[in-house]
């Protein structure tokens, strides 16, 4: 998790941090998280900002305990440089693609799948497809924005909610393309 790099090591121990992202809710997505949580005003907002500021300070200080950073993508490596002023070597994580067979025969729809939260920008995709009534979109995923997504979906959009891996796999194989709009850590 985001705090693992803060471990205090002995002088003779090497500390290597494989970083998937600097803590997004205190750095690059700070304002989005506060807005989505309704914490921009009032006492709760003040306390949240105070605590996030403290976490940001701790995060920066703890980054100096790391001997070497490894990032999961060049994109995250740049964010490590911007956030901690530290270099990182990129080693991409292993991805098991053995469960996904190539399907040559595509059906007439596009697919997006994600946890339905604001920063994944599924609403942006749904709004765009609602304006392209000749294009079909299938949305798979659950989360706090599920009902919002259902309300804004046009007639050409099927919102399936959470589905099993088998259903997701089938839809991924048959879709014309996967549509993605989020600012994702893997780049």
Predicted regions: what is each one?
Residues 78, 82-83, 89, 94-108, ...:
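Acidic anion/phosphate-binding donor-loop and adjacent secondary structure
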Residues 146-170, 177:
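Nucleotide-activated donor-binding/catalytic signature segment of Leloir-type glycosyltransferases, i.e.
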Residues 35-69, 77:
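Membrane-proximal helix-turn-helix segments that form the acceptor-binding/catalytic region
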Residues 173-186:
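Acidic donor-binding loop of glycosyltransferase active sites
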Residues 2-4, 75-77, 144-145, 185:
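Alpha-helix capping/helix-boundary segments
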Residues 72, 94, 112-114, 140-141, ...:
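Short hydrophobic "strand-cap" motifs at the C-terminus of beta-strands
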Residues 101-120, 126-140:
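Conserved donor-binding/catalytic core segment of Leloir-type glycosyltransferases
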Residues 9-41, 89:
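Active-site proximal beta-strand in glycosyltransferases
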């Amino acid at each position: 998790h985001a705090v693992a790099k803060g471990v205090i090591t002995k002088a003779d121990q090497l500390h290597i941090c494989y970083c998937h992202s600097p803590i997004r809710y205190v750095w690059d997505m700070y304002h989005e998280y506060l807005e989505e949580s309704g914490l921009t005003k009032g006492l709760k907002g003040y306390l949240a900002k105070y605590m996030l500021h403290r976490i940001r300070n701790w995060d920066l200080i703890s980054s100096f305990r790391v001997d070497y950073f490894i990032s999961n993508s060049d994109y995250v490596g740049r964010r490590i440089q911007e956030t901690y002023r530290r270099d990182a070597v990129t080693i991409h994580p292993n991805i098991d693609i053995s469960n996904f067979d190539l399907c040559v025969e595509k059906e007439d729809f596009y697919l997006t799948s994600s946890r339905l939260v604001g920063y994944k920008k599924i609403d942006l995709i749904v709004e765009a497809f609602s304006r392209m009534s000749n294009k079909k979109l299938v949305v798979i995923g659950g989360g706090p924005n599920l009902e919002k997504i259902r309300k804004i979906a046009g007639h050409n959009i099927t919102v399936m909610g959470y589905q099993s891996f088998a259903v997701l796999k089938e839809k991924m194989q048959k879709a014309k393309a996967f549509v993605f709009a989020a600012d994702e850590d893997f780049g």
